[in-house]
Amino acid sequence: MFYPFYEVIAEVGLPALFHTGHSGIGSGLPGGGGIRLKYSNPMYVDDLAVDFPELTIVLAHPSFPWQDEALSVALHKQQVYIDLSGWSPRYFPQQLVRYAMLRDRVLFGSDYPLITPDRWLADFAEADFKDEVRPLILKENAARMLGL
């Protein structure tokens, strides 16, 4: 259904961003506000990454509760990135923090106004990321991905 749209995005070199995981939207509402969590599993993006290998894809948020699936897709598909928006770094699962093989494909994101950049950065400073990975996450990976 959206493949013509993805073709255009890939052709002009723009990244496609997909919200993955449980972000809290609809929590506590009757029926979860109609949000079907199964569609936020990052494994659904794997097919798109296969069909459009030239399309840069960003998995927004740490993909809770599917962090391992997100890490697997990003490790397997070189054009897939993970952004860290929507969650305070103090709550990141250890496998996300320690997954060194993806150090070049993890991106900063605050998801403002839900989390202010100042709060996110303060929590990031306390997280257990290696010092050499911090500038990659905060700037260098995004600059490279965007061709800046």
Predicted feature locations:
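Mid-to-C-terminal alpha-helical segments outside catalytic/metal-binding sites
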Residues: 101-105, 115-148
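Conserved, mostly hydrophobic/aromatic
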Residues: 9, 61, 82, 111, ...
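Catalytic pocket-lining loop regions of alpha/beta-barrel enzymes
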Residues: 1-107
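Short glycine-enriched loops at secondary-structure junctions
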Residues: 64, 113-114
